[in-house]
Design a protein with these regions (language model features):
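Non-heme di-metal
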Residues: 1-153
C-alpha cells in the first residue's frame, strides 16, 4: 500500500512533468512550428491538465516546496530548450518524438491512477472526482499520441 505522502510526491512529480510539456509546446508555437492549430490545441490541453492537478493539490491542503517550485521553473525552461530543438528537426521526426512523449505521458498518468487505487485510507479519493479527471487526462494524452502518429504517415 502507498502512503499519502508517497502519493503526494508522485502527484507533484506528474505536475512538474506537465510543466515541461507546456514549455515544449510554447517554444514550438513561438518558432511557428506547423501544424499550428494542433500544437495550440495540445498546449491548451496541457495547461488545463496542469491547472486541474494543481487545483486538486491545493484542495488537499498540500503545497509545493521551494525545491519543487524551482524544479517546475527549471522544467519549463528546459521544455523551451527541447521545444526549440524539436523545431529544427524534420517534421516527421519531430512528430515521432511527440508521439512517443505523449504515449509516455499517458503511461505516467496510468501509473498515478494505480497509485490512487493503492493508497491507504482512501476516504478522500471517494470524496473527490480525481480518478475521473485523471482518466480524462489519460484519454486526452492517448488522443494526442494518436494525432502525432497520424501526422508521421
Amino acid at each position: 500500500m502507498i502512503t499519502d505522502n508517497v502519493f503526494k510526491k508522485k502527484f507533484i512529480k506528474t505536475i512538474i512533468s506537465e510543466d515541461q510539456a507546456i514549455g515544449i509546446y510554447q517554444a514550438e508555437l513561438f518558432w511557428k512550428r506547423r501544424p499550428k492549430d494542433i500544437f495550440q490545441t495540445i498546449l491548451n490541453d496541457e495547461i488545463s491538465h496542469e491547472e486541474q492537478l494543481i487545483k486538486f493539490l491545493y484542495s488537499r491542503g498540500w503545497d509545493f516546496t521551494l525545491m519543487q517550485k524551482s524544479t517546475m521553473n527549471f522544467n519549463r525552461y528546459s521544455g523551451w530548450f527541447i521545444g526549440s530543438l524539436l523545431s529544427t528537426l524534420p517534421r516527421r521526426l519531430c512528430f515521432f518524438f511527440h508521439y512517443m512523449a505523449e504515449k509516455q505521458a499517458a503511461n505516467s498518468y496510468n501509473d498515478l491512477m494505480i497509485s490512487i487505487e493503492n493508497i491507504q485510507g482512501m476516504q478522500w479519493v471517494n470524496s473527490s472526482n480525481i480518478k475521473i479527471k485523471i482518466q480524462k487526462i489519460i484519454d486526452n494524452e492517448k488522443s494526442h499520441s494518436e494525432i502525432f502518429r497520424a501526422l508521421i504517415n
